[in-house]
């Protein structure tokens, strides 16, 4: 499987502060990829580097095998929607579409007009008077109408109400189904990612903690509940990601490639949210232990 975005030892510093450091990952082509992690993980910096809006301090990043924003042809292959869904407040919707057509050689005017009509935007209305959901739909339309091969979305629904989020994501998935666009979607809203993504990347402190097809990850992780015991007594090949214990019971979230046949365990499936929170908690606990060793 070819990688649409590939990074190795990637870092970005602002003076003496690292926003992203020693990040290595590969994001597959032809997928809707959910990128999730805590605040400060480096998600926004990574996506802005991939979009060519920032230059790395160290390491490498490639998009479609080339340096991001290496030229007009490369820029045309990538669409980007930032969290604040930037639009020009004084410009009418129609003027945004004309500007998009002027800037993008592969601009699809019919797609742009159709989407504007579908989401109910008045072409004469100024962008500054649109609601947050309407501005997000305008920004998505501008990104889609350039007909990119890769669409990068940095928390585009973070400030939207549930109905606006649903409409935005529905429009996104309709476009993906129609044009086969690769998508990288960053969000804290795991429930939204679970609805639309088929590939997951969990990023914590610039490190990829887990990555893979959502269906495969969910099938290989389970929640185990049973009489209290040492997790080290589990069969070989079972990796405990998260654990909690009471006086009488142990509850584990574990990764395994083989079925667990011990009848004393009650085994239940996990959700994407369970998975994300477990790996984020594990990364936090690992960091706490390292700090304790240093001190």
Per-region residue spans from a language model:
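The feature captures the beta-strand-to-loop junction immediately N-terminal to the Walker
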Residues: 36-38
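Helix-to-loop junction immediately C-terminal to a conserved catalytic motif
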Residues: 51
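Conserved ABC transporter NBD signature motif
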Residues: 58-74
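ABC-family P-loop ATPase nucleotide-binding domains
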Residues: 83-138
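Catalytic Walker B motif of ABC-type/P-loop ATPase nucleotide-binding domains
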Residues: 151-155, 160
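ABC transporter nucleotide-binding domain
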Residues: 166-254, 291
């Amino acid at each position: 499987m070819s990688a649409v975005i590939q990074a190795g030892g990637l870092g970005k510093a602002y003076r003496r502060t690292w926003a992203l450091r020693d990040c290595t990952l590969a994001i597959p082509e032809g997928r809707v990829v959910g990128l999730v992690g805590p605040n400060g993980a480096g998600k926004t910096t990574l996506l802005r580097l991939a979009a060519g809006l920032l230059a790395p301090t160290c390491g490498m990043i490639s998009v479609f095998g080339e340096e991001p924003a290496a030229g007009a042809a490369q820029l045309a292959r990538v669409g980007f929607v930032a969290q604040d869904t930037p639009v020009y407040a004084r410009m009418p919707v129609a003027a945004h579409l004309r500007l998009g057509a002027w800037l993008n050689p592969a601009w699809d005017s019919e797609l742009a007009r159709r989407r504007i009509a579908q989401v109910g935007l008045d072409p004469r209305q100024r962008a500054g008077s649109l609601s947050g959901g309407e501005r997000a739909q305008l920004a998505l339309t501008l990104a889609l109408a350039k007909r990119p091969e890769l669409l990068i979305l940095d928390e585009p629904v973070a400030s939207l109400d549930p109905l606006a989020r649903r409409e935005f994501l529905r429009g996104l998935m309709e476009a993906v189904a129609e044009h086969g666009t690769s998508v990288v979607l960053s969000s804290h809203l795991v429930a939204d990612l679970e609805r639309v993504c088929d590939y997951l990347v969990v990023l914590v402190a610039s490190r990829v903690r887990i990555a893979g097809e959502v269906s495969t990850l969910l099938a290989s992780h389970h929640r185990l509940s049973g009489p209290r015991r040492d997790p080290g007594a589990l069969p070989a090949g079972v990796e405990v990601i998260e654990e909690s214990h009471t006086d009488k019971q142990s509850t584990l979230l574990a990764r395994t490639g083989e079925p667990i046949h011990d009848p004393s365990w009650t085994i239940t499936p996990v959700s994407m949210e369970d998975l994300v929170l477990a790996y984020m908690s594990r990364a936090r606990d690992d960091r706490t232990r390292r700090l304790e060793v240093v001190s």
